[in-house]
């Protein structure tokens, strides 16, 4: 939904019914069949002397957006897109920490608190206690708990195609699945391909007018909406937040 364009037209006096949007008008109420998660990108890897405790001061230099069919998929897509070398809600430094130290850490509200929170959930710590310590909405904590539950399923079922398919639908990367199955990323990729577990591209269509909108996101659920053409194409490569 082109918020900026619609807002500008409203500002010059146009009514919603007069503003065309994707084959309809801006008066049509948007209907969503996807979820979006945004994660801030903090540059503490470049500014190593900066304090990474978060507060009211702006410290992020950008953000990433993960689009998916479920909250878990959005979380994991976003984490991978941060370009911090992390491919999952997992950091070894937190895996090595005692539980009481993790509880102390999550009350300090740092840029990587979400990874410490995930480690506590991975250890079966109470979501209610974690919520009380961080005030993170339980909806998000429960999504992380489902990610941790899928980790357990994968560990208990190495090379299992059903588990692999379920993990991909939840947003797991081949690289992290490989680490749980003590193999390499390419082996997981080949296993997926051999069993027809490949992503589709779904359309971001909020108005459902039937018009094709070339705004797509990948997912392992649903039907493919991408239309291939013979037109010339370009790839725009972005750098990082700095």
Regions picked out by a protein language model, each given a short descriptive name:
Residues 133-135, 144, 180, 191, ...:
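Residue-level "edge-of-site" marker
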Residues 170, 176-180:
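Extended, domain-scale alpha-helical bundle/helix-rich regions
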Residues 130, 177, 240:
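Conserved hydrophobic/aromatic pocket- or pore-lining residues that grip, position, or stack substrates
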Residues 1-163, 170-171, 195-199, 228, ...:
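ATP-dependent carboxylate activation and anion-phosphoryl transfer catalytic cores
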Residues 23, 186-188:
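Catalytic domains of riboflavin
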Residues 189-242:
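Non-catalytic terminal/interface segments that mediate subunit docking, oligomerization
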Residues 141, 188-189:
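Helix-turn-helix DNA-binding helix
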């Amino acid at each position: 939904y082109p918020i900026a364009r619609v807002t500008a037209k409203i500002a010059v006096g146009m009514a919603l019914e007069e503003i065309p949007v994707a084959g309809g008008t801006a008066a049509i109420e948007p209907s969503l069949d996807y979820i979006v998660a945004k994660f801030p990108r903090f540059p503490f890897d470049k500014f190593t002397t900066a304090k990474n405790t978060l507060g009211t001061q702006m410290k992020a230099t950008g953000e990433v957006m993960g689009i998916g069919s479920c909250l878990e998929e959005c979380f994991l897509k976003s984490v991978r897109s941060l370009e911090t070398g992390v491919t999952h809600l997992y950091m070894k430094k937190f895996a090595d920490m005692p539980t009481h130290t993790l509880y102390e850490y999550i009350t300090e509200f740092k840029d990587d608190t979400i990874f410490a929170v995930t480690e506590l959930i991975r250890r079966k710590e109470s979501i209610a206690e974690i919520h009380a310590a961080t005030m993170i909405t339980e909806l998000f904590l429960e999504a992380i708990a489902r990610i941790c539950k899928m980790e357990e399923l994968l560990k208990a079922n190495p090379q299992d195609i059903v588990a692999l398919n379920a993990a991909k639908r939840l947003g797991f990367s081949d690289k992290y699945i490989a680490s749980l199955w003590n193999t390499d990323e390419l082996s997981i990729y080949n296993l997926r391909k051999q069993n027809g577990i490949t992503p589709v591209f779904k359309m971001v269509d909020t108005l459902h007018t039937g018009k094709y909108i070339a705004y797509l996101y990948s997912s392992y659920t649903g039907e493919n909406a991408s239309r291939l053409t013979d037109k010339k194409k370009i790839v725009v490569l972005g750098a990082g937040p700095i």
